[in-house]
Amino acid sequence: MKMAGSAEKAPVKRRGKPDPKTYWQRRRNSIYLFAARQICARERRNPTAVIDIGSNATPTLEWHRKSGARLVSLDLRRPYVAEGVESLTCDFLEYNPATSYDLVTCFQVLEHVPDPAAFARKLLAIGKTVVVSVPYKWKKGRCKYHLHDPVDERKMKKWFGRDPDYSYIAKELNNVARLIQVYRQ
C-alpha cells in the first residue's frame, strides 16, 4: 500500500477511462449526490472516523470535514487527496484497518468490481454504518465499465447477505436512477 502525496494540479487522464475531475464536475449538483449527502449526515452526526472506498479523486469526504473526524480516502488508483485526508492507494480487499470506522461510504463502485459480494461484505466488516450506492436498473451495456448491470435490490441483498436498514432511489430529471442503501451494525 502506498500513501498518496501532494494534491495534483491537473487531472491524470487514463486511457479509455473518464477523467475523475470531469466526472465529479458533471455530477456535483445531482439529485443523487444531494440525497447521499443528506443520508450520510442523518446517519452519523458526529463521526470520529470516516472512510470513502473507491473515491476516484472525488471530494465527498469534504461533507464530513467540519465534524473533525479522521478522514480516509481509499482507491485502487486515485484516492482523494486534500489537506487533512489520509489518502491510500491500495486494493480494498487487501486493506486491513487497525480499527473500525463510524461511517463507510462507497459510491458507484460495486458495479465495477469483479467480486461484489466479497467487496460488500468487507464494507460491512470495517464499519458501524455503511452508505453505498449503485446505478439502479441500468441496462446491461449502458456503461462499458460496469460488470454487473442491471443492479437492483435483489442483487444487492445477494451481495451484502442481508437486507439494508433502508434504501432510497434517487432519480435525476433525465430518468437516470441510483440506489442508495444504508447498512448498520
Name every feature range the model reports, one short phrase each:
Residues L93, L110-V113, K137:
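Short acidic, S/G/P-rich loop/turn micro-motifs used as interaction or catalytic elements
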Residues L103-V109:
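A short beta-strand submotif of the Rossmann-like class I SAM-dependent methyltransferase core
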Residues V113-P114, G127:
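Helix-to-beta-strand junctions that scaffold the AdoMet/dcAdoMet cofactor pocket
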Residues G127-K139:
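Conserved beta-strand signature within the Rossmann-like core of class I S-adenosyl-L-methionine
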